[in-house]
Amino acid sequence: MNLKSLSALGAGLLLAACSQAPRTDSLTQYVDMRIGTGGHGHVFMGANVPFGAVQLGPTSIPQSWDWTSGYHISDTTVIGFSHTHLNGTGIGDLFDVTVMPVVGQVTYARGTEDDPQSGMWSYFSHANEKARPGYYATRLDRYGIDVELTATKRVGLHKYTFPASADAAVVFDLENGGCWDAPTETFIERADDHTISGYRYSTGWAKDQRVYFTAEFSKPFKSLAIYEGGEDGGLREGDSFRAERLYGRVGFDTSAGETIYVKVAISPVSIENARLNMQAELPGWDFEATAAAADRAWNAELQKVRIETSDDAARRIFYTALYHTMVAPSEFCDVNGDYRGSDGKIYRAVPFVNYTTFSLWDTYRAAQPLMTILHPEKMPDIANTMLHIYRQQGKLPVWHLMGNETDCMVGNPGIPALADAVLKGYGGFDREQAYEALKQSAMLGERGMDLRMKYGYIPCDLFNEAVAYDMEYALADWAVAQVAKELGKTADYDHFLERSKSYRHFFDPQTRFMRGLDSKGRFRTPFNPFRSTHRADDYCEGNAWQYTWLVPHDVEGLIGCFGGKEAFTGKLDSLFVVSSVLEGAASPDISGLIGQYAHGNEPSHHVVYLYTMIGQPWKTADKVREILTTLYHDRPDGLSGNEDVGQMSAWYVLSSLGFYQVEPAGGRYFFGSPLFDKAEVRVRDGVLTVTAHNNSAANKYIQAVKLNGKPYTKPYIAFDDIAAGGVLEFEMGAEPAVWYEL
């Protein structure tokens, strides 16, 4: 690997982005694609459109944890340009249909970094990279080929500028996927002298993934050679072939500076549907117009929030964060409405947009609540997608990827996500069916729930990560209870509300921590609240310091466990000042530490807002401003942990606007400390203007609040007031204050 300092690596990319001359009303100019490409951010780098099925970008040789998106700023290798990528996940997959332009004969393999001839890969220089929303460019040093990429929702458009060669080629790599992914069956066929098609079936995180494609070239190719990878591989005869791992070499003669365009459409259903997608979205070859359309699509979404600030770095961080919240969920259907369901069946011409990449354990906390504000037009489709997943697999999604349930992470995170849509009054789906899905998912006797129903909690001697699973189930039960109450189902409300209090079993009044409890009612010993052993203790990517606060649905009940507000507050204060040392084989996800508060991982994200809920909002303001200004940066390592499909950035977006939804569903956004002087947020019924008067780094404390010109004496703003639009005013000052009554 060619390692340099992060600042040097990113300089070329930043200059290239800034060298563009966008319109004065363009907000894409403030998106810095480098942010999150270093450290443990794991963000996607490449060309796409908002929520698109295609994420077209470079894929590097390494397959270790910091390369789950296929790209890391410390690396300068590329094996090709893949059409699917994940954004900020802690597990790798995808990288489907990887395309690599080459000159001369190559080895058909991923290759190793110690031997440039071991595969097709090439070095590139970050100084030659250009990246902005919907566009990516680089130069392949090994081949002297300039690469530019752009995309529509379902089509990737490649622009390759070749040197003179009688042996130029574009290679389709169907063998190499991402990290845990491996092909199970691949197919390539020649359709005519401009077109090839095929598919890639694979298994990995998504156990049965199927991506079909068709690819057209802007000039006739002179040859198609199909190679089989692996030890027994080699050239295969004919214009079509099916095997576990294939490469298709499409050959050309090129003159110096000649440009060849390649457009690749994908489908989860069939080659025929991939062709339909191409015909509908990209029938022509105008690269500049396609890139401009992608820029317009991104700008239209970014325009939903316009901020006023004199801090240029904060502006870049904000719009990059907003961009990151719209990479996924991604569309998982064709232009004719067809998609592949969780049961493996093809559903035809459905009347909604089907989505995938639901990282719900992460996103129910902030990314989904942000979506309900900024993307009301998408909420019926998101809800219908979840309901169809429920019908096909018998439960709401947990971590859904490419039509597959991965069951990744703990709890029932699809429940608060769907409940939030119901409680916020969204329509376009059957509310009774939604409640059925919520209830049945909450009653399914799997993943520790059978033990929970038997014992009233999940015993730590019978199930791994018992505390984490149970506490996530508890907050999901609360969400079910709120929907039951909304629909007049009193008995269900009482049942699920009581079950949502199961967290109390784990609270040890002696140590004042949540601890593992065995089937005989005994706390696990020995006990160390700083200790975390990844995948082998009572917590999930955390420890007792972090999980003790995972009761966002019943803060009053948690205060009661402590014996009152004074003891609760004292312990909460301690969280931020104790040692940040982690003991045991802790997960690297436990990052962004302030004391034992871990902003780099999701279970901590609501914790700073607990102060507002108990009448000490100045402490929320202190911590929110500290996190906004020290744990987010406009550098490659500008995120304190995994992006996690938009969650890390959604926290920034909401918190910088001045509020955050603490409870897992329902729409009370508690106040913190607005970062910007003014923000205009396009909402369901108009525009919400958020103004912070007398705002500065010193004047970070809310003194008073007005809503539509009238004094507002609540610690939160309700979703309905946000969605209605209007004017929310904060009067800021340098002294702590309380403007509300509890």
Residue ranges and their predicted role:
Residues 476:
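ATP-dependent phospho-/nucleotidyl transfer catalytic cores
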Residues 16-17:
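C-terminal motif of bacterial Sec signal peptides marking the signal peptidase cleavage site
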